[in-house]
Amino acid sequence: MSHHSPPPPKHKGEHKGHGLPRGSERGSSSRGKDRSASVSNSVPMPAGGKASRTNCPPPAPQKTANRLINEKSPYLLQHAHNPVDWYPWGQEAFDKAKKENKPIFLSVGYSTCHWCHMMEEESFQNEEIGHLLNENFVSVMVDREERPDVDKVYMTFVQATSSGGGWPMNVWLTPSLQPFVGGTYFPPEDGLTRVGFRTVLMRICDQWKQNKNTLLENSQRVTTALLARSEISVGDRQLPPSAATMNSRCFQQLDEGYDEEYGGFAEAPKFPTPVILNFLFSYWLSHRVTQDGSRAQQMALHTLKMMANGGIRDHVGQGFHRYSTDRQWHIPHFEKMLYDQAQLSVVYCQAFQISGDEFFSDVAKGILQYVTRNLSHRSGGFYSAEDADSPPERGVKPQEGALYLWTVKEVQQLLPEPVGGASEPLTSGQLLMKHYGLSEAGNINPTQDVNGEMHGQNVLTVRDSLELTGARYGLEVEAVRALLNTGLEKLFQARKHRPKAHLDNKMLAAWNGLMVSGFAVAGSVLGMEKLVTQATNGAKFLKRHMFDVSSGRLKRTCYAGAGGTVEQSNPPCWGFLEDYAFVVRGLLDLYEASQESSWLEWALRLQDIQDKLFWDSHGGGYFCSEAELGTDLPLRLKDDQDGAEPSANSVSAHNLLRLHGLTGHKDWMDKCVCLLTAFSERMRRVPVALPEMVRALSAQQQTLKQIVICGDPQAKDTKALLQCVHSIYIPNKVLILADGDPSSFLSRQLPFLSNLRRVEDRATVYIFENQACSMPITDPCELRKLLHQ
């Protein structure tokens, strides 16, 4: 009989209803839900009661560090003093399991994960549980951000055999690494409706001793089934599906799950999911004259505005938290992830391009201000995340959200100044509290605070418009804006004195690539050269610290060392598909923002390496990992869902299209078509699970615009034309600067550039689309009209 328990923390954006995708979101909130274990298994398990204790009493507490002390990962180092005899993922652990004929206990998480902290504190620091693990299992700890391939393979098993997934992910493997039982967070002891970790360990231990052959057979059967289920191949298909059909179906599925009042999609917990917003903007552009097109734009803009006004946004320190635990975007899970900041900075810039509303550009600037201040290494790289938990005061146990919460008393003490010109007696603190919904009792529903840690605390969330707040107190809008900004700055300065949340100072190539895109796109759209410079510094960091010149390969990780140094793991952790895809995207965005062709050259080189390491020459599309790197794993998978991060295959499809437009090389287009064809069945089945790939499908079937500007890169007229292009939302384009040098890199790639001439010695634009060329344009206003058509 299987273990039955309440639902697990949801994995990677799992949504109930409305046909929305289970993407790559992280586990949901610790508040308002029973965060019990989820157990999946491929074999019968004994029912009821605790298993018999088959081992001698545990030894005296172990004070020395385990072998994880030699690792670089912040997550592994957090477990380096556990009594558990942890191994990192590797041959030493596998050999030990085979030699001693023991199952492997694999635990996967990441350093800013609330429930990973909980399980470590409750179970992995427990001497008796540590002894139980050491005697009966080979225990392996993995940082999912270092080894996304390991995470994806075993999460596929957990999701397929249980009601969901999340982190920490705990899976039991045969010595040959095939999974047979899996789950998420386990409490240490049995409860009324849930099975404790100690009991699960003893049951599995008994089963391994009594029914090992059955375990092995069932494990092999499940692995075979997962392999067949995860197959993605061109098969006998010749072409990808119709973009018009996939667009329409994807939009309809999103429309069905849309929250009319608060924006967003499906039920709480609500995630930002920028890939969905990107799709809606693209859908609007190609359906502007239709009701559905207007609806798509409204859905995206309303969602972005509600998110920015909600508690999911840090109004004091800027940036966005991981997700909202309620449909109102009010109470967040307070973790902050680099990849969210990167993608949201881009989508808020797109909202500004489309609407012209500076509200959206201000949000984008705030995100990038936060990243610059909190997540940036001085050499140009970007850190991974900040934890949700921090001590309310020094020496106290960390609590979720402690850094971000406020009491009325605190705000009154910080902002006691009277507001001049108000229609009634009013302090700056009272104005801020009214605008952001603070109350004496706190504005957090007790059902969202199951541990009672947030009583009397408040999350800042915009309750009224500036106009309404001003009207309530007889103040001008600009006066209200200034008073609120001053108040928020004082709160920010006060917050500096609180204990900081843990910073995961691991730097990942993939997420750094996304952040290069964020700074490059924002810099070009907003006309802020300093942001383009930060993107450039990020790309230089990648090339200096995360690129192996001799092999041309990317390294997955590096780490912040003492004194601002950068440290590498030894041996290096080599890049995965997402590292190449996201870095290539970042370099292409940086090329368009800076017009420095060296970034395009590097992008082409990385794309070549990506094709050699990850391309499936038989079935089409890209595998997540290199063939050699994943030889130990039972599955070699292809990333097939756009979630918190876009699928690397979706991003690669866009990259291939752009590279074809920038070089004219037919191979890139052929690969793109093959990739889209391989994913045909996935798109047809649930297009809303791949909105970024549906966008790529549309771009491939509609063809890209080639916008060529002939001019001196430093001349004012050239810059005016470039800024005109950057200010308009044109997702399916490539932007090329032809400086007239026939020996330049781009002229060698696209010989026709040498034939283009400036008109009357002025910077001139030519637009190529559907094998046709526009008349030459020199006037930015005329160019704007043409691009808006």
From Swiss-Prot:
BP-aspect Gene Ontology terms: carbohydrate metabolic process; cell differentiation; spermatogenesis
Residue numbers carrying Phosphoserine: S5, S652
Domain of life of the native organism: Eukaryota
Entry comment describing in which tissues the protein is expressed: Testis-specific and age-dependent (at protein level). Highly expressed. Expressed in round spermatids located in the inner half-layer of the seminiferous epithelium as well as in early elongated spermatids having cytoplasmic protrusions into the tubular lumen.
Example of a GO cellular component annotation carried by this entry: extracellular region
Coiled coil regions in record: none
InterPro entries in alphabetical order: 6-hairpin_glycosidase_sf, 6hp_glycosidase-like_sf, Ssp411, Ssp411-like_TRX, Thioredoxin-like_sf
Localization in the cell: Secreted
Keywords linked to the UniProt accession: Developmental protein, Differentiation, Phosphoprotein, Secreted, Spermatogenesis
TM annotation in the entry: none
Compositional bias segments (type: Basic residues): 1-19
Start and end residues of each stretch annotated as Disordered: 1-65
Function: May play a role in fertility regulation.
Protein name per the record: Spermatogenesis-associated protein 20
Native species: Rattus norvegicus (Rat)
Upper lineage: Eukaryota, Metazoa, Chordata, Craniata, Vertebrata
Gene name of the record: Spata20
